């Protein structure tokens, strides 16, 4: 027994389709699929549009920067220049165009248990530091979902095979 939460993951503004959210709700209604909470319904964990949760994501990326778990890269002549000094980074985000990257400890391997594949291991030396905040100020899909899953108390996530490593 669980709850069906409808969350609108609209962080990719370049692919945003107007009224797609109402079409999703209409399709769910057509098939008599009733969500327990979401936009305009039992808003216990709202807002349910990720584009309306930017301050929450900002709080978390600032915490990551302060704890040296993430860093900014400032755009300069089309290149991303990393800034690892926390104080300078916090100043630059006020005035510069930037992205935030998660700092990966490339000396490690991560092991997880997947219900379908069993034990899976990832070698972090093969992974670049991923961008978690894009230059438009919006979080990436992965960063927003981890934060939202935590705050919405999501216990089970079902995604396609292509998302396993993320």
Spans of features found by a protein language model:
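Active-site cores that bind ATP or allylic diphosphates and position pyrophosphate for catalysis
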Residues: 18, 63-166
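N-terminal Rossmann-like or analogous alpha/beta NTP/dinucleotide-binding catalytic cores
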Residues: 1-86, 136, 165-166
């Amino acid at each position: 027994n669980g709850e069906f939460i409808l969350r609108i993951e609209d962080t990719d503004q370049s692919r945003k389709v107007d009224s797609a959210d109402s079409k999703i709700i209409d399709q769910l209604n057509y098939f008599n699929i009733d969500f327990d909470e979401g936009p305009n319904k039992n808003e216990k964990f709202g807002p349910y549009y990720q584009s309306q949760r930017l301050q929450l994501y900002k709080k978390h990326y600032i915490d990551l920067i302060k704890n040296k778990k993430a860093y900014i890269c400032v755009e300069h002549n089309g290149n991303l220049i990393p800034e690892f000094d926390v104080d300078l980074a916090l100043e630059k985000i006020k005035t510069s165009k930037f992205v935030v990257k998660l700092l990966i400890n490339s000396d490690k391997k991560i092991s997880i248990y997947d219900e379908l594949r069993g034990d899976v291991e990832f070698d972090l030396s093969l992974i670049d530091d991923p961008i978690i905040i894009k230059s438009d100020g919006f979080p990436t899909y992965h960063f927003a979902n981890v934060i939202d899953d935590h705050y919405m108390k999501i216990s089970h996530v079902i995604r396609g095979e292509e998302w396993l490593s993320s």
